[in-house]
Amino acid sequence: MSLFESVRSQMPAEIPSQLERMDAFWTSYRQSNQEIAKVVQTTSEKLGGKDFDAIICGGTLGIFIACALQRRGWRVAIIEKGILRGRAQEWNISRKELNAFLELDLLTEAELETAIATIYNPARVGFQGGKDLWVRDILNIGVDPVYLLEVLKQKFLDAGGILLEKTAFKQAIAYADGVAVEVALT
């Protein structure tokens, strides 16, 4: 078994097909065969009533801002093409960045500590043929994204946020007083 086959066999079932789709997209894009769809229209007409103060496309990173806004009284919806969940690979971050979750009252101390999977110091930064640089407290904390996103997702929903999973963004129309968003089930 080749190294590629070995690594691929250890991936969750959906990952190889997702990687193949992304690779095909970027190959087509590099060859200038990728048509860029116009997805935002504008009009001077008025929309009238609004259902949300903010609509966020993409939940994996969008959940952070969505949860913060929703918990501050905004009416927020998230449009997520798949299911909003973290991947099985840790995210690296610094303590200073993590503290933003506490400052924004998105996580409790206990939740933050539970989200931390690994802490290490120092870290080596280097490039082939160059001199290694050892740094402390820079991207030295591994966070469990499965846990982190699930906690934020529940807090968002508990605060009244709307999560549209398996829903893709199609287009937006910018009116004089708001934006209408069209979606499609995936």
What is the role of each PLM region?
Residues 181-185:
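Short beta-strand segments that buttress and anchor functional surface loops
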